[in-house]
Amino acid sequence: MLWLAMRRFLVLLWLLSLALAAPRLVVEPEDGVKPLLDLIASAREEILVKMYLWTPSRMDVVEALGEAARRGVRVRVLLEREPSGGRVDLEVFQALKARGVEVRLTTPFRFVFVHEKSLVVDRKRAWVGTMNLTGSSFAANREYALILDDPAQVAEIAKVFEADWEGERLDLSQALLVWAPSRVLGGVKEGNARETLLALIRGAQRELFLEHQAMAD
């Protein structure tokens, strides 16, 4: 009887651990910017941010990162140098630096764009989403993000951040996550997005849902 109770307890612990490690889905515009701000507020040691487009309409995120820096958190932000239609927003760039945030622009010619939108907190949790840091992304657009707790996945996102921060190549041939571009450059496999997406489509048995702003090759 005691053995049976212990077994049930262990099963419950296992199920709880799975639930805690499961990604949390954020859906916009319903969820708004609060989940992102809450994640930033939880940081105690380090925040890594990689962002394609950041406009002054999202100064609330600038302020949240500045507050983290003031309480001793090391905050680094990597911004796309030339997003489509213009250059990096200087107001955002300067506002981040004024608040003690380390800011760099992406290395020229390394990629066409660094289109990633991610944030890593204390190397324990990561935000990966479709949304830029703009007003419409959290208030008017259909966007999605996942908050990840899996240690290996979070470590991989941080590892790619460090490589892009330094403008270095990184072998992603054994990647856990999906990365673009799907190319081999200088003998280094830098991504797996194309083959992963095609395998997912080809593996469909009953249904396939695809929601995308644009599709081209």
Residue ranges and their predicted role:
Residues 2-5, 9-10, 16-106, 110-217:
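Charged, low-complexity intrinsically disordered terminal segments
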